Amino acid sequence: MYCLTVIYPRPDDEAHFKKYYKETHIPLAKQLPGLKSCHYAYPAAIGPADNVPFCIFQAWFESPDAMGQAMQSDMGKKVGADVPNYSPKGATIFHFAAE
């Protein structure tokens, strides 16, 4: 399996982020072609930490090619273009093969 991970910084308006993300962005992301599953969470630090992400999203695909095709699809482009609507500070995106 192959994972696309998105890490979001703490927004200025947390309530707007959470509402928009749950009601608008996640339903879009769930339409990515080839998506096997996706999950998101609002993590908490264990002990003192200043660099804990506000939100983490993971999307699972069968392969790197499936992920690439999803991200280059019309829906993938729509999902990417939606990010500034709830996360004006952007996001960090990375991917990996699960072992």
How would you describe each model-predicted region?
Residues 1-99:
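Macromolecular interaction modules
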